[in-house]
Amino acid sequence: MVRKTCLITLGLSAYLCGWGQQKEQPNIVFYITDDMGWMDTPLYNSATQVQNPNLEKIAKQGLVFNKAFIASPACAPSRAALLTGLMPARTGAEANHTYPNPKFPLLHKGLQESGYEVAAFGKVAHGEMNHACGFDFYSGGMNGLTENVTEYLDNRTEGAPVALLVGDRRPHVPWTDKLLYQPAEITVPDFLINTKETREHRAMYYSDITGVDQEVGRIYELARERFGDNFILVFSSDHGAQWPFAKWNLYDAGIKVPLLVVWPGHIAPNTRTDAMVSWIDIFPTLLDVVGNKVSDNLDGESFRKVLEGKTDQFRENIFTTHSGDGKMNVYPIRSVRNDRFKFILNLYPENYHSNHSDILRKPRAGAYWDSWDKAAKTDPAAAAIIQKYYVRPAEEFYDLKIDPTEQKNLIDNDEYQEQIQKMRQLLEAWMNEQGDTRALFETPYPISGPRPHELGIR
């Protein structure tokens, strides 16, 4: 898909056009989780041990996207891309804990201009940006989300349609210590190291996901009670989980996310689509649903036709970027993915990849890392996983049809050289179009020195 890119200097009125309202605009419920991997819900993985009965029930009423992706696998740039419809290099929110340039309109304001009351709960934007978004109502409490939404609905003046943006902190670390799963029974993915400590932490992580499921179920029932069939519900996550090769990485474990949409009377129930969509497309789609159009100045586009079953095709390519997270993750990466292949560019492979998990090793987060180091001393397979985690080649290429977990790098395989060159050139052209400066935002950890954990917190 070829898109036009240009600087956005016009106001919101020039950004959004065609504000004609439908006779009965649907209320909107957008439920966002934090660090939830797509493989860790039975919506996508029948072999997972995670129980999500509510999400499975809700999915029978709507459409599940098999190939939904985010713009960047860290909270701040991912959520900035969601709210602006722009990729990180354009918004200025590239590294984690950074914010978009205020000259770029936030797309939920288009809902407000169209008569919607926009209420946000929990973590919708990142950090202090929640207070600067101009929501009509904001409650920052992370606990009791359904109770907070109910109280808001009870006290608001009826009349205007409402958009409820609900941000659940789970399953972001620290994970819960109230276990719903027995660690001894946990099956560990092959790309992680199977230790007692890994299983204990997976049990915590899984328990948080089931907690999310319970909350989503309550929110869904509340929407049905208050809105009848006149609502559209979106469920998704800002990126993959805080595990090695997931969050802060451009493997599918980091960039591919659950996406479920329910829209009674418009979306065929119990359906799935292979259309590739990005988080930058979500708000353009919602604006389209309520009767508005978004200009071509955005990177995002409406996939309303996919929702309505008119097409099963959308994006030909998904571009993703990662630019780092403070002093503990200084490893910029870029990638392009199509329906079958992925090309990854590690911009500075002379440095170690690292992040908060392996450096801090906090309880209920990354404390399993000590057991990994111990296992690697006697187990060559464990040592290979750790080496792959820390040291990356300049380029990676995967055939996702035969290697969906991206374990075999085919960058030097003669059979794929034509496809590799095509995707290499495609990514380079897109980066230039975006104005990507390939910046290092902190001092990296050179592989000529000790591993980051050995240096401690800088």
Model-derived features: positions:
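C-terminal helical cap and adjacent loop that interface with cofactors, partners, or active-site loops
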Residues: 401
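Formylglycine-dependent sulfatase
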Residues: 2-4, 19-396, 404-425, 429-432, ...
